[in-house]
Amino acid sequence: MITFSQMLLKLQEFWAKQGCNIVQPYDIPAGAGTFHPATLLRSLDSTPWSTAYVAPSRRPTDGRYGENPNRLGAYYQFQVLIKPSPDNIQDLYLQSLEFLGLDVSKHDIRFVEDNWESPTLGAWGLGWEVWLDGMEVTQFTYFQQVGGLPCSPVAVEITYGTERLAMYLQGVDSVFDIVWNENEFGKTTYADVHKEGEYEFSKYNFEIANTEMLFRHFDDAFNECKSCLGAGLPLPAYDQCMIASHAFNTLDARKAISVTERQNYILKVRELAQGCAVLYKEQESDRLKRVGR
């Protein structure tokens, strides 16, 4: 049986062999792997770029106090971005499943059309969900636009739902029963690592989080992002955009934002993301000179 840790390592090994740069998780909370600058900003580059990484993801509204076997407020995605998109990307994906020990000839694997959109990032793309014997385990997206800008050449993003995939590979019905690691020293489960965190962060996100503080955090990050953009610094600006986005997500979980206000906050985050994307793209030639390209 493949453990959760082994699965993540093998995905990195497989995609490294396909030419992807293995980067590390980003150090700011985000709701999805797409938020990582290695995907969001680098997808706008005119030059080729390939990367893969584990993406710890936080979605405060999805927490269920550790009581739901299939729903988490924090989880792991495995993210792949390749630009330009290779013609054999579906075959490569199927090969990655085989590399994990899955005999794809013995399973029903379907690519179901499911176009993707992120209103807060001003991004959208054409793509599919990948269903493995009726369960969605991956999202494929051909980025058409990011931060309101066209992606040229088009990049392909693959996002593995790692917990779902591990549940399937291990034959367990609860995410908390996933074997995280097993060796001569003993066995560690997903529950050992994360169940208490699911309970405590659900309580925090739904009941305890100081909304006045979070509103201040949002405003501070919004203003700091604008200052960084004015200073010509898209990377620090984008950090502040991510901080604002996470503050908004926590406020949303606390039900501190009305339906009308919610749309306004989404538009504010989108304004920041678009500002970062536009400045990042405008500086491309200067940036390439600075890094010696």
Curated annotation (Swiss-Prot):
<dbReference type="Pfam" id="PF02091">
    <property type="entry name" value="tRNA-synt_2e"/>
</dbReference>
<dbReference type="InterPro" id="IPR006194">
    <property type="entry name" value="Gly-tRNA-synth_heterodimer"/>
</dbReference>
<keyword id="KW-0030">Aminoacyl-tRNA synthetase</keyword>
<keyword id="KW-0648">Protein biosynthesis</keyword>
<keyword id="KW-0436">Ligase</keyword>
<keyword id="KW-0547">Nucleotide-binding</keyword>
<dbReference type="InterPro" id="IPR045864">
    <property type="entry name" value="aa-tRNA-synth_II/BPL/LPL"/>
</dbReference>
<keyword id="KW-0067">ATP-binding</keyword>
<dbReference type="GO" id="GO:0005829">
    <property type="term" value="C:cytosol"/>
</dbReference>
<comment type="similarity">
    <text>Belongs to the class-II aminoacyl-tRNA synthetase family.</text>
</comment>
<comment type="subunit">
    <text>Tetramer of two alpha and two beta subunits.</text>
</comment>
<protein>
    <recommendedName>
        <fullName>Glycine--tRNA ligase alpha subunit</fullName>
        <ecNumber>6.1.1.14</ecNumber>
    </recommendedName>
</protein>
<keyword id="KW-0963">Cytoplasm</keyword>
<dbReference type="GO" id="GO:0005524">
    <property type="term" value="F:ATP binding"/>
</dbReference>
<dbReference type="GO" id="GO:0004820">
    <property type="term" value="F:glycine-tRNA ligase activity"/>
</dbReference>
<dbReference type="GO" id="GO:0006426">
    <property type="term" value="P:glycyl-tRNA aminoacylation"/>
</dbReference>
<dbReference type="InterPro" id="IPR002310">
    <property type="entry name" value="Gly-tRNA_ligase_asu"/>
</dbReference>
